[in-house]
């Protein structure tokens, strides 16, 4: 893993690194303010860590918010067992490098029943391994606030979600019953059993994320950069064919393609894109002319119309 400039920046305010663009600096300040507000206001916060680019930026901001101390809350990874191998390797390196407290949770029912995206379909698999698994982990830790890396530009239901997203005791989200947010004033008062999902990156865009990664030299999973990789075409997506658990269907042929991923999740449900972007500059240039959302590469968002809002109402990330 390449060395990361954040270590130098966090420990040396007089670093010679160029100052942030004013737009990125304003976003950074807002996110850091949100982290500190939640840490002061809630008893048991936790940060949802899904290992992708947004989680990497979220972690960097959390480290900045509480420097020179350690991040004062644990990271929670709801593992499904079907993440890209590169993601798990990256996660373990980051946890060790930054001395983080990581909680890993796999839904025991799903594991016992061998729930997979191949045998149960994307909708049921996601409900059991992600939504149910997340609710289990939050209940076990008695967490009253959970940071997430969702952004409003990603998808319609996320566009209308507040920065403080209130959840019922069974973790459900009612978009009709949310509190107004005036400027940077957040109302974190909750009843016993209720909780809040907090989204410090709400006002960031995908391009903002990448420009910040570039400016701060934040480590990310190599899958975001183009490389020749084995793939198969399935359900209108290019699926990475590097895991022996992926069984080829009779009409499928594995082939090498120059690809990268705009979004990372479970490998059987995440589509790659053809790309020649091998550097941060290339990725940013590619995104500046993109006409579709990064979520187009997620099979779980195609289950039905409004599927993301339905999942969020049931307790999804």
From Swiss-Prot:
Q: Which GO molecular function annotations are given, in alphabetical order?
A: ATP binding; sulfate adenylyltransferase (ATP) activity
Tell me the pathway. Sulfur metabolism; hydrogen sulfide biosynthesis; sulfite from sulfate: step 1/3
Give positions of region: Disordered.
1-22, 298-317
Q: Which domain of life is it from?
A: Bacteria
Look up keyword Transferase and say if it applies: yes
| A Pfam family matched in the record | PAPS_reduct
Which InterPro entries does this UniProt record tie to the protein? PAPS_reduct_dom, Rossmann-like_a/b/a_fold, SO4_adenylTrfase_ssu, Sulfate_adenylyltrnsfr_sub2
Reaction equations catalysed: sulfate + ATP + H(+) = adenosine 5'-phosphosulfate + diphosphate
User: Subunit structure, briefly?
Assistant: Heterodimer composed of CysD, the smaller subunit, and CysN.
What does the UniProt record say this protein does?
With CysN forms the ATP sulfurylase (ATPS) that catalyzes the adenylation of sulfate producing adenosine 5'-phosphosulfate (APS) and diphosphate, the first enzymatic step in sulfur assimilation pathway. APS synthesis involves the formation of a high-energy phosphoric-sulfuric acid anhydride bond driven by GTP hydrolysis by CysN coupled to ATP hydrolysis by CysD.
What family does this belong to?
Belongs to the PAPS reductase family. CysD subfamily.
PANTHER family reported for this sequence: SULFATE ADENYLYLTRANSFERASE SUBUNIT 2
UniProt protein name: Sulfate adenylyltransferase subunit 2
Native species = Rhizobium rhizogenes (strain K84 / ATCC BAA-868) (Agrobacterium radiobacter)
Identify the taxonomic lineage of the organism of origin: Bacteria, Pseudomonadati, Pseudomonadota, Alphaproteobacteria, Hyphomicrobiales
């Amino acid at each position: 893993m390449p060395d990361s400039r954040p270590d130098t920046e966090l420990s040396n305010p007089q670093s010679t690194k160029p100052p942030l663009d004013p737009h990125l600096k304003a976003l950074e300040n807002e996110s850091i303010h949100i982290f500190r507000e939640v840490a002061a206001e809630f008893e048991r916060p936790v940060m949802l860590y899904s290992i992708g680019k947004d989680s990497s930026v979220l972690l960097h901001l959390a480290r900045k918010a509480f420097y020179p101390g350690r991040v004062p809350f644990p990271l929670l990874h709801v593992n499904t067992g079907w993440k890209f191998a590169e993601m798990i390797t990256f996660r373990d390196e980051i946890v060790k490098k930054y001395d983080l407290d990581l909680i890993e949770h796999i839904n025991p029912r799903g594991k016992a029943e061998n729930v997979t995206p191949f045998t149960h379909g994307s909708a049921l698999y996601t409900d059991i391994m992600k939504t149910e698994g997340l609710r289990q982990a939050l209940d076990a830790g008695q967490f009253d606030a959970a940071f997430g890396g969702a952004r409003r530009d990603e998808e319609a239901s996320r566009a209308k979600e507040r920065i403080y997203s209130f959840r019922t005791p069974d973790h459900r989200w009612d978009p009709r019953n949310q509190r107004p947010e005036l400027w940077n004033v957040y109302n974190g008062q909750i009843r016993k059993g209720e909780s809040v999902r907090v989204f410090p990156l709400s006002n960031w865009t995908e391009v903002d994320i990448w420009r910040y990664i570039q400016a701060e030299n934040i480590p990310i999973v190599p899958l975001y950069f183009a490389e020749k990789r084995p793939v198969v075409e399935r359900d209108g997506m290019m699926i990475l064919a590097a895991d022996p658990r992926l069984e080829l269907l009779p009409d499928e042929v594995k082939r090498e393609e120059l690809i990268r991923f705009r979004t990372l999740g479970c490998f059987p449900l995440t589509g790659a894109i053809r790309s020649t972007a091998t550097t941060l500059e290339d990725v940013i240039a590619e995104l500046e002319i993109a006409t579709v959302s990064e979520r187009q590469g997620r099979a779980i968002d195609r289950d039905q119309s409004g599927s993301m809002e339905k999942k969020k109402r049931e307790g999804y990330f």
